[in-house]
Amino acid sequence: MPAQRLDGRQLAAQLEEVMAAAIASGLPRAGRPPGLAVLRVGDDPASGVYVANKEKACARVGLVSHGAHLDAATPQAEIEAKLRQLNQDPAVDGILVQLPVPAGLDDRALLLELDPAKDADGLHPLNLGRLLRGEPGPRSCTPAGVMALLRSNGIDPAGKRAVVIGRSILVGQPMALMLQAANATVTVVHSRTADLAAHTREAEILVVAAGKPGMIGADHVRPGAAVVDVGIHRKPEGGLCGDVRSAEVEPIASALSPVPGGVGPMTVTMLLLNTVRAWSQRFDLPDPTPGY
């Protein structure tokens, strides 16, 4: 039987509809729509595409996008001053620093300048600490998108063995914390793990965020596992691929996220959701998507 398709595009569209309705109903009380500021430094082409996609998503749900594009030669102090300005802007509810930033800039120092309440990407150390403590706050977008995909497809992590490949602060570490909070038994493996396949074959839920095209094949996957592919890479011959060799894995997995169309759309949706939630809390409005 083919693996269940973990369709991020479909779920993202559903959540966008819910957010659009929540914004429309909250406007009379709030007096303005939610605002998301995306700070981009330099002219990295991939970052330009990502920012354009986020702006389109904002328009679909009724958020105002406050773009801030600075030259690659902009000094660190000037960028930090711009972030402090956005922190004080009453029309801005969420702020995202588009990563990566140009060489020579300290992205960690930039993230520290964010008002944690406006941290749309969930990467401020205070918000990561809240995640560790199980306290409410903005959540890292990609792991939160993975959890939403699992939940919406009836995959409950409770009591299951979950393995996360990758230990980055962007995906791997918060992913492990979210799965643990959902009562999974979690193992994190990485580039220095001996006999990787011995660990991954134990996983009932396998989240792959290794950043290596086609790293995971059928020999890494337990039959019946739910496999979430976070990776996305451009192939030399054109098109996109993930960290998972999907043609091999699809026949043996119970569920598999496609690339593209799986985790990627959910990352953008969770960015919007963090912003809409911050706006809702500011004006004492109901949570737009309880459970997500």
UniProtKB/Swiss-Prot annotation:
InterPro entries: Aminoacid_DH-like_N_sf, NAD(P)-bd_dom_sf, THF_DH/CycHdrlase, THF_DH/CycHdrlase_cat_dom, THF_DH/CycHdrlase_CS, THF_DH/CycHdrlase_NAD-bd_dom
GO cellular component: cytosol
Annotated PROSITE patterns: THF_DHG_CYH_2 (PS00767)
Phosphoprotein as UniProt keyword: no
Gene Ontology BP, a term: methionine biosynthetic process
Ion transport listed as a keyword: no
PANTHER family in alphabetical order: C-1-TETRAHYDROFOLATE SYNTHASE, CYTOPLASMIC, C-1-TETRAHYDROFOLATE SYNTHASE, CYTOPLASMIC-RELATED
Known partners and oligomeric status: Homodimer.
Protein name (database record): Bifunctional protein FolD
Taxonomic source organism: Synechococcus sp. (strain RCC307)
Classification lineage: Bacteria, Bacillati, Cyanobacteriota, Cyanophyceae, Synechococcales
